[in-house]
Regions:
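Boundary/linker segments flanking structured domains
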Residues: 1-70, 74-203
């Protein structure tokens, strides 16, 4: 998921002007996967086929019993106005600020996680949600040398409205409902590690 230097150490880079800040580096494989799956969404939207609802994605962590889900989310093809292509994927080939919700900017996963983990960020940009993420993923935060506790992985795919979800009796499953179902299942099976705050099954 992230680009590593040695062992479980995670590489960082500087972005922003006039005052640069450090952010965590996504792996080239993660970047390529997101761009490839978003290309399907963009082509589908341009052709007005409207087969794909968007991306479903998971962040996962290696545990002794295997790989377990840490966070489940989605990035929809259509934006909030007039059927336009979502700004989260619109310029995915060249722009990493939003990057299908995994962008480098604040208010996106990489930017906000970096604020919680790395030194030098404005305290007002450090969100409780990502403090939780940082505690789950990294040996320590407020550091300039981030190190994973365990290996972390990323998976995503372009989700067709014709695809079946985990409950095949429901038939073709739309992206929003799929996300709801997957979070519910993961919270039941892996509730002690799942980082999603919304959509969890109540104990």
């Amino acid at each position: 998921m992230f680009e590593t230097s040695s062992g479980l150490g995670v590489k960082t880079k500087q972005i922003g002007k006039p005052t640069p800040r450090s952010i965590l580096c996504r792996s080239p494989e993660m970047d390529a996967l997101i761009r490839a799956e978003c290309a399907k969404l963009i082509d589908d939207w341009k052709q007005k086929a409207f087969e794909y609802d968007g991306l479903i994605y998971m962040m996962l962590k290696e545990e002794t019993e295997g790989v377990v889900p840490l966070y489940i989310g989605k990035a929809e093809t259509i934006g909030k106005t007039n059927g336009n292509l979502s700004i989260n994927i619109k310029n995915i080939k060249t722009d990493t600020q939003k990057f299908a919700r995994w962008g480098d900017n604040y208010k996106y996963h990489i930017g906000d996680l970096s604020a919680a983990v790395l030194l030098g960020h404005d305290p007002k940009e450090i969100k409780y949600k990502y403090i939780d993420w940082a505690g789950s993923l990294f040996e320590k935060n407020a550091t300039d040398a981030p190190v994973f506790k365990r290996k972390v992985f990323f998976w995503t795919m372009a989700w067709s409205s014709k695809n079946l979800g985990p409950w095949i009796e429901f038939g073709p499953t739309r992206l929003t409902f799929l996300e709801y179902l997957l979070i519910g299942l993961a919270s039941s099976a892996f509730g002690d590690v799942l980082l999603n705050r919304e959509g969890r099954n109540r104990a």
